[in-house]
Design a protein with these regions (language model features):
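Cysteine-nucleophile amide-bond enzymes
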Residues: 101-158, 173-179, 288, 316-318, ...
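Positively charged n-region of N-terminal signal peptides that target proteins for export
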Residues: 1-4
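Compositionally biased alpha-helical segments
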Residues: 20-138
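Active-site-adjacent structural elements in enzyme catalytic domains
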Residues: 135-138, 142-234, 327
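Bacterial N-terminal signal peptides
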Residues: 7-17
Length: 376
């Protein structure tokens, strides 16, 4: 009997000796150690809480510690079951989860911002036709500067309408997206030419403008091209507007595709039975922080001793972007509008000028209101 029992014990001991030593010595949650030395630091009264592919977390006499498994010596790495491949897989999964979470957050923020913008836009439209409250001043220029949307120079091509539309579009897009993005006037010039199958004639030296009209595209033609062809970032088709060049090279198919999928823009003519009503509605838009592209009669350059449209006789047509107004009396007829021009920052007040209500009520032709729509 004793001999048989002794044989069983020996067999058990032999079987135990065949088990991997590493398994018997593996550290994991619940493992208690009198001490654990990692590098130059010795932790005492250690109790392991968690072990994952990257780290081990444990309690010790003086608090809590989290150590990367990759920083352990090989013997401890083996005891904690460190596997570099498993760590890499865990890191990849973590990064993917972070990107997915960021994408969901960005989409939610964009959706909330779009809903808010739409609500504000609809509220503004509901005010059209009602008397607009004229404030002392509404000035979007500081926000334009903050977004680095400075006055551009159209060069010698008759493209003022393109620049006026793009200026308004860049601003409302930046307000909606939260970050500024510059768009390609070069592309929109090409697109407008495609839509109406014509090119404008080159503008002469503005210092001797006289009767030389900026006879390019009408605002309605430009916004038709915008709705038809879209618009890409400026980086996709940089502006190459020269001093005399009048023809724009066609963009690549890829750029056209990008432009058409870059979002949809709804275009509205500012309503009004007359220019006085239109200007009243423009005040509503500016109060809501929405710039307006306008087409108006324009005086001879020699008659503009200051960047102010007041009582000069008109000589030709031009397009600019209204970005604010001043009205110290609160009466619409005493308003002076602020506009952004496309003749460079050296013109006027850093590229901006002014137009009295009296001038615009007589000479305003067109006023365009742009509305961003959700991307498909």
């Amino acid at each position: 009997m004793k001999s048989r029992l002794f044989s069983v014990i020996l067999a058990c001991l032999a079987l135990a000796s065949l088990l991997p030593a590493a398994e018997a010595e593996r550290y994991g949650p619940g493992t208690r150690l009198e001490k654990l030395t990692i590098g130059a630091t010795t932790y005492r009264d250690v109790r392991v809480k968690t072990v994952n592919a990257r780290t081990v977390l444990f309690l010790h006499r003086d608090g809590m510690a989290s150590i990367k498994l990759s920083e352990l010596d090989p013997a401890l790495q083996e005891k904690f079951g460190y596997d570099p491949a498993a760590e890499a897989e865990s890191d990849a999964a973590m990064q993917a989860a972070i990107k997915e979470r960021e994408a969901r957050t960005a989409a939610a923020v964009a959706q909330r911002r779009a809903a808010q913008n739409q609500s504000q836009f609809d509220a503004m439209l509901r005010l059209f036709g009602t008397p607009a409250p004229c404030r002392d001043e509404v000035d979007l220029r500081p926000r334009f500067r903050e977004l680095e949307l400075y006055a551009k120079d159209q060069g010698r091509r008759p493209s003022c309408s393109v620049f006026a539309v793009v200026s308004a579009l860049e601003f409302i897009n930046a307000q909606s997206a939260g970050t500024p993005e510059k768009f390609s006037e070069e592309y929109l010039i090409w697109a407008t030419g495609r839509v109406i199958q014509r090119l404008g004639t080159a503008v002469q030296d503005r210092s001797q403008a006289g009767d030389d009209a900026d006879t390019g595209y009408a605002l309605t033609e430009v916004v038709t091209a915008l709705r038809t062809y879209g618009i890409p970032p400026e980086s996709s088709m940089p502006n190459t507007i020269g001093r005399t060049k009048n023809i724009t090279a066609a963009p690549s198919t890829e750029v056209i595709t990008e432009a058409r999928t870059n979002g949809q823009v709804a275009v509205h003519l500012v309503p009004g039975r007359d220019t006085a009503t239109q200007l009243n509605n423009i005040i509503h838009a500016l109060n809501a922080g929405v710039p307006i592209a306008i087409g108006t009669a324009w005086p001879r350059f020699s008659n503009m001793r200051a960047a102010l449209l007041n009582s000069q006789p008109p000589a030709y047509n031009h397009a600019v972007t209204l970005v604010g107004y001043r009205c110290p009396t609160g009466k619409l007829e005493d308003t002076t509008f602020i506009f952004k021009n496309s003749w460079g920052a050296a013109w006027g007040a850093n590229g901006y000028g002014f137009a009295t209500y009296r001038y615009l009520v007589q000479h305003l032709h067109t006023a365009i209101l742009l509305e961003l729509q959700d991307r498909p």
